[in-house]
Swiss-Prot record:
Record-given protein name: D-alanine--D-alanine ligase
Domain ATP-grasp: 146-352
Residue numbers binding ATP: 179-234
Keyword RNA-binding found: no
Source species: Chlorobium phaeobacteroides (strain DSM 266 / SMG 266 / 2430)
Molecular function per GO: ATP binding; D-alanine-D-alanine ligase activity; metal ion binding
Length: 363
């Protein structure tokens, strides 16, 4: 029986480019070589597609060490220089349409997790891992996610949405509105980025301008939310029509909140599996995660994050990640490993779920 060809798509134009490469490297290492032939497909920061030797060489890089020893900018510049000096030509889309049986999407953030690559694959009729166009797009937008899960009866942090154009047209009015509606601290975040990129915790009015301008550099829509008390608790969900829910996990940030540097550079955060909350709260978090997954129309996989206040028993949904990280420190594979599903079997199941769903038949 001939092997099925899996396009492992990684890199991309988002600020999470480097993390995508680390995820793809982990995934490639465990795909069953007796069932699947892996075709690495690397997308540069500028959006140029490569396969073959150059893509394979990118997968061999120790990006995790590069991020720790240099910086995000320096690592990105190294990758750009490699792309500029490769003699290889760009990707042949005719081959893509004819030679791929399914795709494992290992892209994170914009242009990968937001429905765009999913729409392209649907157009070509290629099955792929994870959520479809609509669920991906809605979950990527934190403001839209809040609307959807609130309708399903799931609590979210009090917040408002601000367009960057509104802020720049009248900064003082925006600041005044925020000050009148919230007590400090608040979080200011781009509506559609992951890995905590562009997020600031604001403790007083003097920090607000810098936080708003930082968020506006990354997105045209900004979310301002009340900072919630409690533990950061995460749940992994896997499946299509009958999703499985992992046990809970907890993040204890190494800094004031779980930001990009804490996640991928300093590695200072502590993880607890299961989360240090009561069994009753753990079960309720798992139920809320499944409700959110279904409300958004998710398929394949998602990691769903909450704030849990044990004193009050309050559970608040923070965000839904439709393509969670697959790095050595990523919570999604760790949660399923702790639930009895090893990493290689997790990847195998994701490929099976992709093949179960005809392209274009998912939300």
């Amino acid at each position: 029986m001939p092997l099925s060809t899996v396009a492992l798509i990684f890199g991309g134009k988002s600020t999470e480019h480097e993390i995508s490469i680390i995820s793809a490297k982990s995934i490639a290492a465990v795909i069953d070589p007796f069932r699947f032939q892996v075709l690495p497909l690397y997308i540069t920061h500028e959006g140029k597609w490569f396969t073959g030797e150059f893509a394979e060489n990118i997968l061999q890089l120790d990006l995790a060490e590069m991020l720790r020893s240099t910086s995000l900018d320096a690592t990105g510049n190294t990758l750009r220089q490699m792309a500029m000096h490769t003699g290889q030509q760009g990707f042949d889309f005719d081959f893509f349409k004819a030679g791929i049986d399914l795709a494992f999407i290992a892209l994170h953030g914009s242009y990968g997790e937001d429905g765009r690559i999913q729409g392209l694959l649907d157009t070509f009729g290629i099955p792929y891992t994870g959520c479809g166009v609509l669920a991906s797009a809605v979950a990527m937008d934190k403001a839209l996610t809040k609307l959807c899960v609130t309708e399903a009866g799931i609590a979210t942090a009090p917040g408002i949405t601000i367009l960057s154009s509104e802020y720049f047209a009248d900064p003082k009015s925006t600041q005044k509105s925020i000050e009148e509606q919230f007590t400090w601290p608040v979080f200011v975040k781009p509506a559609s980025l992951g890995s905590s990129v562009g997020i600031s915790k604001v403790h007083h009015i003097g920090e607000l301008i810098a936080a708003l301008e930082t968020a506006c550099r990354y997105d045209s829509k900004i979310l301002v939310e009340k900072a919630m008390q409690g533990r950061e608790v995460e749940v992994a969900v896997l499946g299509n029509n009958a999703p499985e829910v992992s046990i809970t996990g907890e993040i204890e940030p190494g800094s004031e909140f779980y930001d990009y540097a804490d996640k991928y550079i300093h590695n200072a955060a502590k993880m607890y599996i299961p989360a240090r909350i009561s069994p009753e709260l753990q079960e309720q978090v798992r139920k809320d995660a499944l409700r959110a997954y279904k409300a958004l129309g998710c398929r394949g996989m998602s990691r769903i994050d909450f704030f849990v206040d044990e004193t009050s028993g309050t559970i608040v949904l923070n965000e839904v990640n439709t393509i969670p990280g697959f790095t050595d420190i990523s919570m999604y594979p760790r949660l399923f490993a702790a639930s009895g599903l090893p990493f290689n079997e997790l990847v195998e199941k994701l490929l099976q779920f992709a093949l179960e769903t005809p392209s274009g038949a998912r939300s």
